[in-house]
Amino acid sequence: MKTLRHIWFPLLLLLAVFTAPAQAARLVIMIGENEYRTWETLPEFAKNDITPHGHHVTIIQADEADKNHFPGLIEALRNADLLLVSVRRRTPRREQLDSIRAHVAAGKPVIGIRTASHAFALTPKAVISDPSLGVWPEFDAQVLGGHYTGHYGRDAATIAVTPGRESHPILSGIAVKKLIGHGGLYKNTPLEKTATLLLTGTIPGQITEPVAWTHHHGAKPGRVFYTSLGHADDFKVPDFRRLLLNAIAWALHP
């Protein structure tokens, strides 16, 4: 697994999944989790779904020998237009975490999937013994607008559109009934008041939970999209990939 890969393909076609024609942008995809195989699904998604739109994508993978080290992240974020996060409970080096904070402070877009809600948060009993590493447990609430507290297990959830949000551009062309939520439903209630709920999920005997929403962060408000979907089987569903593409287009063009 390479830690830094640059993927570039010329503009070959424009798919209808984007809500509007998009100018070429520089995207950074940050990957550091061991559960949902996004180290495979996201590079494939970048190659097959993002780069045909002319975008340049830099994949940053956690170092195989040091799961908290993300080689190339600082350099990649300096000129990035958008950051997509798929990280679970990592404590990056402080300077790497600072580069993410700088991206956020500049009002640049952020997209989070699945475990991004607890990307830089440790479990309650865990401690950091290395002072060069940092945590950011508030990333979920401050940036993503969520409130992750766990999940309900592996039961698939029934996904539905929030009433009144049917015409939101991120949901354009999405057959929501085809979204399943293969990895189990996350507990994300309540969202921040500044979040806009788009999709909910329900499993029998439990309350309905937020599954996808938008948010704005920072003094220079940047667009944010988060979804608790992102299991490897979700990426097999064209409507889920279309959802992410729509979110990228929406985030890049306020």
Question: Would you name each region that the model predicts?
Answer:
Residues I59, V110, L197, V224-Y226:
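Conserved beta-strand scaffold positions in the cores of enzyme catalytic domains, especially
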Residues W8-T19:
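Bacterial N-terminal signal peptides
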Residues M1-H6:
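Positively charged n-region of N-terminal signal peptides that target proteins for export
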Residues V135, F139-L144, Y148, K178-A195, ...:
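Oxidoreductase and adenylate-handling cofactor-binding alpha/beta cores
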Residues T51, H56, N79, G146-K220:
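Catalytic beta-strand/loop cores that center a nucleophilic Ser/Cys/Thr
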Residues M30, R89-P169:
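A glycine-rich, often tryptophan-bearing local segment used as a flexible ligand/cofactor-contacting loop or short
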Residues A24-R26, I31, T41, N48, ...:
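Extracellular ligand-binding/catalytic regions of CAZymes and related secreted enzymes
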Residues R26-I29, N34-A119:
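Helical hinge/lid and interdomain linker segments adjacent to catalytic or ligand-binding clefts
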